Amino acid sequence: MYFFRALLSPVVLWPALVSGKSNSNTANYTVEELWDLEVTFWDNFLYPANVKQVEAINSTLFTTEVQGRVDITRVFNGSELNTEYIFGLFSDPNHLSLVGVPIAYSITQFIAERNIASATTVVTFNATSFGNLLLPVTIDTWIMWDANGRIMQYDATFRWFGFLLDTLVEALATSINGTASQATAALTQLLATTVCDTHDKYCTGENQQYDNSTACYDFLTTAIPLGKDYELGRDTLLCREVHEHMVQYDPKMHCPHIGPTGGDYCVNDQTYEQKVLQKYFNVSWIVGVPWTGNIWLGD
């Protein structure tokens, strides 16, 4: 659910080179062409267009080896995984979900050069699980495209996500005529029940993670925390809520993510410093200056 922070670099965006590691598919688009590519992505992010992207399994909007990072969750590699998370996570209005489905957007900030665009987009979500509450969600993005107009890298931040979670809890508290604490407890129960139902349906045989539904529910409600706004990629219930949506697409891959171990995604394997300094991207986001000291570039 989790989605895009774009803090613009203070360097001048000159049409020179993309510093750091080179890429044979590096393109040189006009600003208008990059705007069109940006709009194409967001058009397909909305429901129900995102359903068609999910059904494609490997969205043609991504390169095969696309790299993606979302601040509140983790990094995502490859077109299939990114198709499941970027489009599949928000594609079912009838399934319990924190923010529901995206129904409209407005790009409020945009700057672009060569094959990179940095933008801020306010996406309106219909939180169908919270009485069709309409929520404006601010998503900051850096996106890089290859010569074929496919996304090869993206870096995303959900701005004010903690405020968003508090707003959802307040809405739930109002609906149950209770306190914020009671609403948080109710949300925990709802999410745990949904995760366990999904586990029982899809995580069978070698993919089974819990002995039974009771063991699943007890673990999710007592052994791990619900999670804070930055913990949708840590050992929390909120992280498992994110991955629960993906289980139906690939049980073998995603069942461990909702299980007790958390798989490779819902685990506390990073300190704050390690999160910030993680070397990940293959191509530098710095454009037009001979700077080779980008600490985010992978080895």
Swiss-Prot record:
Superkingdom field: Eukaryota
Residues passing through the membrane, by range: none
Residues of the signal peptide: 1-20
Top-level EC class: transferase
Record keyword Thylakoid present: no
Keywords: Acyltransferase, Glycoprotein, Signal, Transferase
Associated pathway: Secondary metabolite biosynthesis; terpenoid biosynthesis
Gene Ontology biological-process annotations: terpenoid biosynthetic process
EC numbers, comma separated: 2.3.1.-
UniProt-recorded Gene Ontology molecular function terms: acyltransferase activity
Glycosylation sites per record: 28, 58, 77, 126, 177, 212, 282
Keyword set includes Coiled coil: no
Role played: Acetyltransferase; part of the gene cluster that mediates the biosynthesis of an ophiobolin family sesterterpenoid. Sesterterpenoid synthase; part of the gene cluster that mediates the biosynthesis of an ophiobolin family sesterterpenoid.
Sequence similarity: Belongs to the bfoA family.
Protein name as it appears in the record: Ophiobolin family sesterterpenoid biosynthesis cluster acetyltransferase
